[in-house]
């Protein structure tokens, strides 16, 4: 008998959702991704789309899972637009605690925006960061 190998991290709540061990309100699924309503929504219809295979963040997620998440997010966006008729949508991915990631299983937020709500906001302030030219040079120079 062949034993099915789990792709889950035993301590991950999102892996528990994928495996059916944690209750969720599933709204969509494909072969490699799963979509469910956020337990702490910032708007009606706030949906999370996750890969079924555990990955800590966007950068560590395999390409097949990234594609599946993106396609399912698009499907969820169309469903949200059709059924809830928001004025717009935000697609949000946070990577790392400093960026606001709270569950360390890659996930994309699909957040409907309504006439009375705020768009995706962040604090804009002057910083002492490098110039745009310095960042461009760092990102485009050849690496040894």
Swiss-Prot record:
Residues 13-120 form the HIT domain. One of its GO terms (molecular function) is catalytic activity. GO terms for biological process: nucleotide metabolic process. Pfam families: HIT. A motif (Histidine triad motif) lies at residues 105-109. PANTHER family: ADENOSINE 5'-MONOPHOSPHORAMIDASE HNT1, HIT FAMILY PROTEIN 1. This is Uncharacterized 16.1 kDa HIT-like protein. It comes from Mycoplasma pneumoniae (strain ATCC 29342 / M129 / Subtype 1).
């Amino acid at each position: 008998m062949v034993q099915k190998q789990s792709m889950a991290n035993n301590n991950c709540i999102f892996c528990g959702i994928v495996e059916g061990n944690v209750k969720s309100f599933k709204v969509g699924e494909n072969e490699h991704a799963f979509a469910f309503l956020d337990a702490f929504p910032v708007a009606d219809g706030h949906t999370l789309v996750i890969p079924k295979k555990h990955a800590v963040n966007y950068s560590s997620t395999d390409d097949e899972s990234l594609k599946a998440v993106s396609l399912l997010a698009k499907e969820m966006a169309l469903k949200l637009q059709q059924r809830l008729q928001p004025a717009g949508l935000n697609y949000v991915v946070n990577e790392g605690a400093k960026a606001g990631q709270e569950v360390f299983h890659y996930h994309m937020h699909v957040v409907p925006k309504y006439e009375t709500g705020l768009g995706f906001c962040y604090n804009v302030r002057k910083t002492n960061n490098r110039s745009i030219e310095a960042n461009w040079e760092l990102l485009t120079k050849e690496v040894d």
